[in-house]
Amino acid sequence: MTRKDGRAYDELRPIKITTDFVKFPEGSCLIECGDTKVLCCASIEDKTPPHVAEGEGWVTAEYSMLPRANRERSKRDIAKLKLSPRSAEIQRLVGRSLRAAVDMKALGERTINIDCEVLQGDGGTRTASVTGGFVALALACRKLVEEGYLGSTPIRHFVTGVSAGIVDEQPMLDLQYSEDSRAQVDLNCVMNELGEIIELQGTGEGRAFTLNEQQELVRLCAKGNRELLKIQKEALGGKL
């Protein structure tokens, strides 16, 4: 099956990761997934939240969208004096996913904050934030090693994320907005380089779905995540 943009049903959009996109954070990248563009920045603090065990570090994330990242302008969360439920859900997902990449004891008593700013949204912003956020995180950890604060990187796994869905009864990988907005089933899948699942979110938007359909969507996501892993490694110069 050929889609509106010419892709096969199991094909990712064109993916590009530009590292060191801004100069002040310890790690940064711009990830482009088709027309979705997310700026990911990693900042290091020499302290941890109160709930973190002594001798361990922490990784957390924040997610937001530029007011005109979509077709119509939306108000910033700060203008509403509270974080939107959607933003809160997404940044928790990104934070959980990236914590799975790190040995917190090896990181030591410091926090790495991952800020994900959607510059343009055309579907898949949360999974793009995971994939790009990991690259920014890895660059920040590399800087800790290069500057002598750590003997080796605390990164233990690569982490990527991608979406899949059922549109017009056809399972598809990496939905753009025109597909996502009419999907009968929507699924987000975060995996490590071993093919293990870190996060799986599946929703019946227009109808319920079967276990066989879920397995097919996960299979598509596994294929997409393997391809994203190669792109991450290329962006990082083949090493952590």
Protein language model annotation of sequence segments:
Residues 1-32:
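Short, Gly/Pro- and small/polar-rich lid/capping loops
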Residues 15-18, 24-27, 45-47, 99-101, ...:
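Glycine-rich, charged/polar anion/phosphate-binding loops
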Residues 16-18, 30-32, 39-41, 60-62, ...:
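Structured core elements
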Residues 21, 29-107, 197-219:
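Glycine-rich, flexible beta-strand/loop modules in the N-terminal catalytic cores of phosphate-handling
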Residues 29-31, 125-132:
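Conserved phosphate/anionic-ligand binding catalytic regions in large, soluble enzymes, centered on
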Residues 79-83, 116-125:
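A short glycine/serine-rich beta->alpha loop
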Residues 85, 106-109, 124-128, 138-142, ...:
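A structural signal for small-residue-enriched, beta-sheet-centric alpha/beta enzyme cores
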Residues 94, 98, 132-141:
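Buried hydrophobic packing segments
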